[in-house]
């Protein structure tokens, strides 16, 4: 143990699984501290009451189990969608976007219970340790963060199970062997990494995909879906108004049937290494395509292009755990301002893994049929294009003449 001020009470991000159950007991022993557990329902699809029973069995008296699905989608996913945020051109940031909310609630519960520390179960190799801790420190710079995987010597499955058995911690039969891969899930996505997925040359086995049906087995008939937006946020599906979490749940169900949202990606982690992940984001893939579709007819060209320039920076900040940073908030303010007229409906076609926008309509549309028609019109004089081209060509002509004068043929 370090010479730091002793910890009296710690709030643990607790799933009820083997790892965090061991961490709970380890915190009690190694720090001689009272442990408060916090379990979040972010739409991961797991029964959460077992976490309560396990925490009670471990002697925990303050147990927080919270349904955060609406807050998660409304306050974290939707702002990300307004930004069209995609990391390294492909990744829809499903794990990254869940961490700020968990960090926020850890801090809030610590304040409410008088805890002087929080703890998480992220390993010392991944991005999540960074995301959790940057979030905590941004909200309370004086709160201590404990990361057991960076402190203890329980560095194998065998040691974890032995520790659990020595301390009377329940170990499910299916947890005694080494899991073939690790899974993280929430309402936005499911990610699978490690073990059988570590060789990027090998195709992922069918058992990896838990959120989506195989595109090859999807219906032979396409399905059409209409999504309505107000100020950049999705508010209805097929004419039915619904809350953010309910809407995303509906899109997840549609995407699952049609095999939408699968991604096999090797990404650059913030901590320096490359990692291979299998991501399933069925509803998110549909929603992102729809949002792009409504922006196509409602955003001014300059605003649209500026957003596309800002998006990679926004996505990088989110991926690296800087959700609560001033620069992310500055970008968000600009992005949100751009969305005031992003209102209307988008019609999409789902078919065997693909999502295609096939229709868009809006009272705020900037699309003018009178101006773009190939037929004869009275609003646009094509002769005007000549002066426009000459002005834009001037610098290119001057460059070309200099090359000719100096004999530069390249």
Curated annotation (Swiss-Prot):
Family statement drawn from the similarity comment of this UniProt entry: Belongs to the argininosuccinate synthase family. Type 1 subfamily.
Top-rank taxon, per record: Bacteria
Assembly and binders: Homotetramer.
Residues reported to bind ATP: 13-21, 40, 121
UniProt-annotated binding residues for L-aspartate: 123, 127-128
GO CC field: cytoplasm
Subcellular location: Cytoplasm
Keyword hit for 4Fe-4S: no
Record EC number: 6.3.4.5
MF (Gene Ontology): argininosuccinate synthase activity; ATP binding
Catalysed reactions, semicolon-separated: L-citrulline + L-aspartate + ATP = 2-(N(omega)-L-arginino)succinate + AMP + diphosphate + H(+)
HAMAP family linked to this entry: Arg_succ_synth_type1
Binding site for L-citrulline: 91, 96, 127, 131, 182, 191, 267, 279
Cited NCBIfam families: argG, PRK00509.1
Record pathway: Amino-acid biosynthesis; L-arginine biosynthesis; L-arginine from L-ornithine and carbamoyl phosphate: step 2/3
SUPFAM superfamilies, per the entry: Adenine nucleotide alpha hydrolases-like, Argininosuccinate synthetase, C-terminal domain
Entry's transmembrane regions: none
One BP term from GO: urea cycle
This protein's record includes keyword Cytoplasm: yes
Protein name: Argininosuccinate synthase
UniProt KW keywords: Amino-acid biosynthesis, Arginine biosynthesis, ATP-binding, Cytoplasm, Ligase, Nucleotide-binding
Predominant subcellular localization, coarse grouping: cytoplasm
A Pfam family recorded for this sequence: Arginosuc_syn_C
């Amino acid at each position: 143990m370090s010479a730091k001020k002793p910890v009296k009470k710690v709030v643990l991000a607790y799933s009820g699984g083997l790892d965090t159950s061991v961490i709970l007991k380890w915190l009690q022993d190694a720090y001689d501290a009272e442990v408060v557990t916090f379990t979040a329902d972010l739409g991961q699809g797991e029964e959460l009451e077992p976490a309560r029973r396990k925490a009670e069995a471990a002697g925990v008296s303050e147990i927080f189990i919270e349904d955060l699905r609406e807050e998660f989608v409304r306050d974290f996913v939707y702002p990300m969608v307004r930004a069209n945020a995609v990391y390294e051109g492909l990744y829809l940031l499903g794990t990254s976007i869940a961490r700020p909310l968990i960090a926020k609630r850890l801090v809030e519960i610590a304040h409410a219970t008088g805890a002087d520390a929080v703890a998480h179960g992220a390993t010392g190799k991944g991005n999540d340790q960074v995301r959790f801790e940057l979030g905590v420190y941004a909200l309370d710079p004086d709160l201590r963060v404990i990361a057991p995987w960076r402190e203890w010597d329980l560095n194998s499955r065998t040691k974890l199970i032995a520790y659990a058995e020595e301390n009377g911690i329940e170990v499910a039969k299916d947890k005694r062997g080494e899991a073939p891969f690790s899974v993280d899930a929430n309402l936005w996505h499911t990610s699978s990494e490690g073990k059988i997925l570590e060789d990027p040359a090998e195709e992922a086995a069918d058992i990896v995909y838990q959120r989506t049906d195989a595109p090859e087995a999807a219906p032979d008939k396409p399905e059409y879906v209409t999504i309505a937006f107000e100020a950049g946020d999705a508010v209805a599906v097929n004419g039915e108004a619904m809350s953010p979490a309910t809407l995303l749940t509906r899109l997840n169900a549609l995407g699952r049937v049609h095999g939408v949202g699968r991604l096999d990606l090797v990404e650059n982690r913030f901590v320096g290494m490359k990692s291979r992940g299998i991501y399933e984001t069925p509803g998110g893939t549909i929603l992102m395509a729809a949002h792009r579709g409504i922006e196509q007819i409602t955003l001014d060209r300059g605003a649209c292009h500026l957003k596309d320039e800002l998006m990679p920076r926004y996505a990088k900040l989110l991926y690296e755990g800087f959700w609560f940073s001033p620069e992310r908030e500055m970008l968000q303010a600009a992005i949100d301002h751009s969305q005031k007229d992003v209102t209307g409906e988008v019609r999409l076609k789902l078919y065997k893994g693909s999502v295609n926008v096939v229709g868009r309509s809006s009272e705020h549309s900037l699309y003018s049929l009178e101006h773009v028609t190939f037929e004869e019109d009275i609003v646009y004089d094509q002769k005007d294009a000549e002066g426009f081209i000459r002005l834009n060509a001037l610098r290119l002509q001057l460059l070309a003449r200099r090359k000719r004068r100096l004999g530069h043929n390249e």
